[in-house]
Amino acid sequence: DLILSPYINIEKNEARSTMRLIDSNPDLRRNILLTKINTDLREIIKNKETTYRLSNLMVLYNNMLQSLFNSQISTLGASIVILSIMFFILFRSFKIVFIALVANVTPIFLLFGIMGWLNIPLDIMTITIAAIAIGIAVDDTIHFIHRFEEEFKFDKDYVNAMRRSHRGIGHAMYYTTIIIVIGFSILMLSNLVPTIYFGLLTGIIMINVLAADLLLLPKLLLMFKPYEKLKEITK
């Protein structure tokens, strides 16, 4: 009884099977493994009256991670919609909305590409980086576009406005990003691997955001020329 009682309950007609695996294996894909186990059990258990349930810390952690992953996707989608509305209210231009969204979303896609290239998995720490990045990117984007619009009013020249904007606000954005990167890089001294990844990837996304706001954003403004109406009004 001492041996069988943890695994078999005759009164409730229940049985428990235990399986051990190395959860720290970097090649382990928990969600794929659990899905495969569920699929195999459905094929093996033909009796419709027989039910089964997977449990343990790995199942709990995987469910929590999948829930967080799905919530992050929905949150990012909602953030893009809200940002579109906010950009339109601030700048009253669909071109500006498109330009600002491209400049904000591109660094996030680039980050996920780097994570895939380096085989860095999504976990509780790394999955929140996108939300942090888009929050900081929006702030820099609004500052640059507003400064660009103010500089454009002087001579109605896109190239000169871009140069003055870089001289005026570019330095502040650059030094702010450097300070943030240095601050988050301290996390790389941690002994916890997810914390190390968080510090490393946050620094990378901050550099991506700075590059997008100082290189991609001005280029998009020069390409799409969103202030042509302002140019015509002043004439």
Give the ranges of each region predicted by the language model.
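Solvent-exposed, non-transmembrane alpha-helical starts
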Residues: S24-T35
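Extracytoplasmic
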Residues: D1-I22, N63
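Generic structural hydrophobic/aromatic packing signal, biased to beta-strands
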Residues: S17, I37, L54-S55
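General structural signal for secondary-structure boundaries
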Residues: I10, N25-P26, K48
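Membrane-embedded transmembrane helical bundles of large multi-pass transporters/channels
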Residues: R42-K235
